[in-house]
Curated annotation (Swiss-Prot):
<keyword id="KW-0150">Chloroplast</keyword>
<keyword id="KW-0396">Initiation factor</keyword>
<dbReference type="Pfam" id="PF01176">
    <property type="entry name" value="eIF-1a"/>
</dbReference>
<dbReference type="InterPro" id="IPR012340">
    <property type="entry name" value="NA-bd_OB-fold"/>
</dbReference>
<keyword id="KW-0648">Protein biosynthesis</keyword>
<feature type="domain" description="S1-like">
    <location>
        <begin position="1"/>
        <end position="71"/>
    </location>
</feature>
<comment type="subunit">
    <text>Component of the 30S ribosomal translation pre-initiation complex which assembles on the 30S ribosome in the order IF-2 and IF-3, IF-1 and N-formylmethionyl-tRNA(fMet); mRNA recruitment can occur at any time during PIC assembly.</text>
</comment>
<dbReference type="GO" id="GO:0019843">
    <property type="term" value="F:rRNA binding"/>
</dbReference>
<dbReference type="GO" id="GO:0043022">
    <property type="term" value="F:ribosome binding"/>
</dbReference>
<comment type="similarity">
    <text>Belongs to the IF-1 family.</text>
</comment>
<dbReference type="InterPro" id="IPR003029">
    <property type="entry name" value="S1_domain"/>
</dbReference>
<keyword id="KW-0694">RNA-binding</keyword>
<comment type="function">
    <text>One of the essential components for the initiation of protein synthesis. Stabilizes the binding of IF-2 and IF-3 on the 30S subunit to which N-formylmethionyl-tRNA(fMet) subsequently binds. Helps modulate mRNA selection, yielding the 30S pre-initiation complex (PIC). Upon addition of the 50S ribosomal subunit IF-1, IF-2 and IF-3 are released leaving the mature 70S translation initiation complex.</text>
</comment>
<keyword id="KW-0699">rRNA-binding</keyword>
<dbReference type="GO" id="GO:0005829">
    <property type="term" value="C:cytosol"/>
</dbReference>
<dbReference type="InterPro" id="IPR004368">
    <property type="entry name" value="TIF_IF1"/>
</dbReference>
<dbReference type="InterPro" id="IPR006196">
    <property type="entry name" value="RNA-binding_domain_S1_IF1"/>
</dbReference>
Amino acid sequence: MKEQKWVHEGLITESLPNGMFRVRLDNEDLILGYISGRIRRSFIRILPGDRVKIEVSRYDSTRGRIIYRLRNKDSND
């Protein structure tokens, strides 16, 4: 049976080594996020200040996998 995961949105607050990031969720929780393989393969750059979707396990709510970088409203791309 596949593990159930929660999907949250958050803001990247700090960049850490090896594709890890400190993410502040919309509910004000601060968790550790790592880049999913699909984002890593696509060479998508994630910087502090970016909004992301993050998938969090029910069993360990202190870590999550970054699955999507949301587009900023003020950028031209």
